């Protein structure tokens, strides 16, 4: 059995998990998330804990039990606490402004770049050079943060661009004569 799948998922107070034949739904303060259940994994719920076991002894079922356990754990954490990703804009004149479900970026192009946020994702700008992406779905938060970063990734010579707050950019040395 997968080492990850051996650990049960603890369901905190205020979070409701329903396991149907083909769907796992997690409902909480942060919203509702659902996931298709894999036929290779048996999910059992008892005394506030979810347990995941492979349906058979195949390697694929073993691996899938650990994967499904971690996905459900991320859903439970997302609806109870939420996830956030911080980005910073480095460069002269680079700034961001959040207006409702849109993010406006001025990052050195001849035009401002507007990015629409999907439902369930909120974006804030505490300062003009910081962007915070929040949401209940860990995968979507990371995906939106990656799309924002892709507008102007950090360049290796001066480090200008959009980067994750905890990202370290290795600056290259310029060509010498």
UniProtKB/Swiss-Prot annotation:
One cellular-component annotation, GO: cytosolic large ribosomal subunit
Function, as annotated: This protein binds to the 23S rRNA, and is important in its secondary structure. It is located near the subunit interface in the base of the L7/L12 stalk, and near the tRNA binding site of the peptidyltransferase center.
Protein name: Large ribosomal subunit protein uL6
GO terms assigned for molecular function: rRNA binding; structural constituent of ribosome
Keyword Ribosomal protein on entry: yes
Alphabetical list of NCBIfam families matching this protein: L6_bact (TIGR03654)
Quaternary structure note: Part of the 50S ribosomal subunit.
PROSITE patterns recorded: RIBOSOMAL_L6_1 (PS00525)
GO terms classed as biological process: cytoplasmic translation
Keywords tagged on the record: Ribonucleoprotein, Ribosomal protein, RNA-binding, rRNA-binding
Family indicated by similarity: Belongs to the universal ribosomal protein uL6 family.
Organism: Verminephrobacter eiseniae (strain EF01-2)
């Amino acid at each position: 059995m997968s080492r990850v799948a051996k650990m049960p998922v603890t369901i905190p107070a205020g979070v409701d998990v329903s396991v149907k034949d083909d769907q796992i739904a997690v409902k909480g303060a942060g919203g509702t998330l659902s996931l298709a259940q894999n036929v290779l994994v048996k999910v059992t719920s008892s005394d506030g804990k979810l347990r995941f076991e492979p349906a058979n002894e195949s390697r694929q079922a073993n691996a899938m039990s650990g994967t499904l356990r971690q996905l459900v754990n991320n859903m439970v954490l997302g609806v109870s606490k939420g996830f956030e990703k911080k980005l910073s804009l480095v460069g002269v004149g680079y700034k961001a402004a959040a207006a409702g479900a849109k993010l406006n970026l001025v990052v050195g192009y001849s035009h401002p770049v507007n990015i629409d946020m999907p439902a369930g994702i909120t974006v804030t700008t505490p300062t003009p050079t910081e962007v915070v992406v929040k949401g209940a779905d860990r995968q979507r938060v990371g995906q939106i943060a990656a799309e924002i970063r892709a507008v102007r990734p950090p360049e290796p010579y001066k480090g200008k661009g959009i980067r994750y707050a905890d990202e370290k950019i290795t600056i290259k040395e310029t060509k010498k004569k």
